[in-house]
Amino acid sequence: MLSLLLPKSNRFLLRTFEIPNSLCSLFFFRLISSDHESSDLSLPSSPSSSPSQCLVKSVCSLVCTSYLRQNHVVSSPHRVNLDFDANSLTHEQAITVVASLASESGSMVALCFFYWAVGFEKFRHFMRLYLVTADSLLANGNLQKAHEVMRCMLRNFSEIGRLNEAVGMVMDMQNQGLTPSSITMNCVLEIAVELGLIEYAENVFDEMSVRGVVPDSSSYKLMVIGCFRDGKIQEADRWLTGMIQRGFIPDNATCTLILTALCENGLVNRAIWYFRKMIDLGFKPNLINFTSLIDGLCKKGSIKQAFEMLEEMVRNGWKPNVYTHTALIDGLCKRGWTEKAFRLFLKLVRSDTYKPNVHTYTSMIGGYCKEDKLNRAEMLFSRMKEQGLFPNVNTYTTLINGHCKAGSFGRAYELMNLMGDEGFMPNIYTYNAAIDSLCKKSRAPEAYELLNKAFSCGLEADGVTYTILIQEQCKQNDINQALAFFCRMNKTGFEADMRLNNILIAAFCRQKKMKESERLFQLVVSLGLIPTKETYTSMISCYCKEGDIDLALKYFHNMKRHGCVPDSFTYGSLISGLCKKSMVDEACKLYEAMIDRGLSPPEVTRVTLAYEYCKRNDSANAMILLEPLDKKLWIRTVRTLVRKLCSEKKVGVAALFFQKLLEKDSSADRVTLAAFTTACSESGKNNLVTDLTERISRGVG
């Protein structure tokens, strides 16, 4: 078997190269080579020996001598120090040396030479060296070390993109008697995961069963880690479920990765479910595991659950550290509970064990900036410096963002300059915070100037930058420039999220470009993005304004398919559209459905529907429609309705509602009275004005 892997010219060396056949006889090599250590460190050659044979003998002697001088540790590969130029050894001579050493001096000596050889580029990717070494070890019955050589080959060949070739050889070695082991196959999975070759790893996993290798806990763990790292959350969930079902328990490090990945993708409840399931299987969570869940709950806004998890952690004997406290402080600040966060912050300040770090201060500064308490934010900014903590880019960006939102651009620019003085360059997030606020304050030219400065510093626009620019162009009704930015964004590699697509769809709708908005809507769906309530409301509102009530109703009914619940604005838009088409009965049904859902109709919706009843001379139903409103809301709605009726010269119905208005509020407002007086005068019905004026003057409702 082995001889077939050797070059023909060297096969006879296995027979003619007389090396003592026991490891003890290595002392013989040491003795006979000691006389030559001061010269060329080579064995004396017989007259019949060729130069190649002499070189092989010399190398074998050097390896044996070096091996005896080393302190060997069973758990680690043996290393030898050979005072020998590897370049003078050919590929064929190298495999002859390793085969000869394995045959005559034992597996460990051969393995020493093997590791020495693959340390050189010349032999590192010479596949036959690995195969001959593994085959030689296999012939000695040393399957464990043969697998070790195969794993070494897998790692080294993966470096040059030849993983698949190496895996093929591992599989082929089964024909030579080396059946793939779970450790070797897990090595393949690990390499594939590190390279991001998840589909390849899945294929290898399937091949394991075919080859009779039973996947173990490490196999599943590697697949779970790979899918999570690659962002394939559903696939990771599937592998993790399979792992749990087989009773395999992840280690603490893997558990942290699982919990963090699930929480970052908004699957906090799923993370908690797995956490509980693993505990049921005997998993012992540590401080980092608990902190990962607490952080996820805080980012979700589930502060109460986060503190309940904290209590459970303490019951399990773990004391919260600065990272646990920082997660809670950050969560409290994001919910607007800054004072509660500050009390927790002070607890850290007074602690003898842990002190607030840069991230803790940054979270508190962000909380105060959110509440426009910039003086307190600045106080903490100074305090952290006094404590010997250096603000990082995120700290500066948080404070700059706070000042920009408050309109304090002078201080924001001052902080940006201070960053540079302290060795921190503002990043694109810093500039985004400034240009976003400038655009919202109608200072777009200044924002563009600042953005050009960012580009001159070598920064590049990210997805947020493009979103800000597109939103500004849509606000200016320059849809062409917005689309130009949108195209550039896609070419740069940034994908538009649903929020940005909503901005563009709304802009198209405002300009009554329904074909474009329809195309963009369909594109969004085809890309796997899920339209939101805002998307549908924009489309429905525009179709209603265009008088295309059928398409508006179609989009309204499709909302459920994407899990979108219409709000009062969605209902209001559709009711207005139905009223324009004189479909009052359908509009009334929608109005009742909106009330049943607990939604409060906008005033314009109430007025529109009541007005449609009045147009049909059905003031009684108009009265019934408005009857459930409380007094204040009723008065405001009826005043608006009276003015609308007056503008349409429907004085008779207006007088009826005006009379009802005076019954609830004897002091008519000037605007409504003026509108009614003008309408009566223009319609020649001054008697109505006289009658109502007398009632107002008497204060009679």
UniProtKB/Swiss-Prot annotation:
<comment type="similarity">
    <text>Belongs to the PPR family. P subfamily.</text>
</comment>
<feature type="repeat" description="PPR 9">
    <location>
        <begin position="427"/>
        <end position="461"/>
    </location>
</feature>
<feature type="repeat" description="PPR 11">
    <location>
        <begin position="497"/>
        <end position="531"/>
    </location>
</feature>
<dbReference type="InterPro" id="IPR002885">
    <property type="entry name" value="Pentatricopeptide_rpt"/>
</dbReference>
<dbReference type="InterPro" id="IPR011990">
    <property type="entry name" value="TPR-like_helical_dom_sf"/>
</dbReference>
<keyword id="KW-0677">Repeat</keyword>
<feature type="repeat" description="PPR 13">
    <location>
        <begin position="567"/>
        <end position="601"/>
    </location>
</feature>
<feature type="repeat" description="PPR 15">
    <location>
        <begin position="634"/>
        <end position="668"/>
    </location>
</feature>
<feature type="repeat" description="PPR 4">
    <location>
        <begin position="251"/>
        <end position="285"/>
    </location>
</feature>
<feature type="repeat" description="PPR 7">
    <location>
        <begin position="357"/>
        <end position="391"/>
    </location>
</feature>
<feature type="repeat" description="PPR 14">
    <location>
        <begin position="602"/>
        <end position="632"/>
    </location>
</feature>
<feature type="repeat" description="PPR 8">
    <location>
        <begin position="392"/>
        <end position="426"/>
    </location>
</feature>
<feature type="repeat" description="PPR 1">
    <location>
        <begin position="146"/>
        <end position="180"/>
    </location>
</feature>
<dbReference type="Pfam" id="PF13041">
    <property type="entry name" value="PPR_2"/>
</dbReference>
<feature type="repeat" description="PPR 6">
    <location>
        <begin position="321"/>
        <end position="356"/>
    </location>
</feature>
<dbReference type="Pfam" id="PF01535">
    <property type="entry name" value="PPR"/>
</dbReference>
<feature type="repeat" description="PPR 3">
    <location>
        <begin position="216"/>
        <end position="250"/>
    </location>
</feature>
<feature type="repeat" description="PPR 2">
    <location>
        <begin position="181"/>
        <end position="215"/>
    </location>
</feature>
<feature type="repeat" description="PPR 10">
    <location>
        <begin position="462"/>
        <end position="496"/>
    </location>
</feature>
<protein>
    <recommendedName>
        <fullName>Pentatricopeptide repeat-containing protein At4g19890</fullName>
    </recommendedName>
</protein>
<feature type="repeat" description="PPR 12">
    <location>
        <begin position="532"/>
        <end position="566"/>
    </location>
</feature>
<feature type="repeat" description="PPR 5">
    <location>
        <begin position="286"/>
        <end position="320"/>
    </location>
</feature>
